[in-house]
Structures are given as C-alpha cells and as structure tokens.
C-alpha cells in the first residue's frame, strides 16, 4: 500500500 489504501 503506497498510498492507495482502498486499492492495496
């Protein structure tokens, strides 16, 4: 999770 917490 690089920042897109909703994605992964």
UniProtKB/Swiss-Prot annotation:
Domain of life of the source: Eukaryota
Function according to Swiss-Prot or TrEMBL: This cephalomyotropic peptide stimulates contractile activity of cockroach protodeum (hindgut).
Keywords assigned: Amidation, Neuropeptide, Secreted
Keyword Secreted: yes
Protein's name in the database: Leucokinin-2
CC terms in the record's Gene Ontology section: extracellular region
Coiled coil (UniProt feature): none
Residues annotated with Glycine amide modification: 8
Subcellular location: Secreted
